[in-house]
Amino acid sequence: MKANELKEKSVEELNAELLRLLREQFDLRMKLNTDQLAQAHLVKQVRRDIARVKTVLNQKAGA
């Protein structure tokens, strides 16, 4: 997910995306801890996507 794509979305869409990513992160962590996750790099990728969404939300709140 690119930051430019996120900047075009509304605050409501960003909040929905953040909620979806947090749920996905939870699911990935559960699978990782129970040795059901073969693609461990997805945890890092989702964590960074969450950071991108939060950054754009903070930028929109300040503007």
Swiss-Prot record:
It comes from Psychromonas ingrahamii (strain DSM 17664 / CCUG 51855 / 37). Pfam families: Ribosomal_L29. CDD domains: Ribosomal_L29_HIP (cd00427). GO terms for cellular component: cytosolic large ribosomal subunit. Coiled coil: none annotated. PANTHER family: 60S RIBOSOMAL PROTEIN L35/50S RIBOSOMAL PROTEIN L29 (PTHR10916), LARGE RIBOSOMAL SUBUNIT PROTEIN UL29C (PTHR10916:SF0). Belongs to the universal ribosomal protein uL29 family. One of its GO terms (biological process) is translation. It comes from the Bacteria. InterPro entries: Ribosomal_protein_uL29, Ribosomal_uL29, Ribosomal_uL29_sf. The gene is rpmC. Keywords: Ribonucleoprotein, Ribosomal protein. This is Large ribosomal subunit protein uL29. One of its GO terms (molecular function) is structural constituent of ribosome.
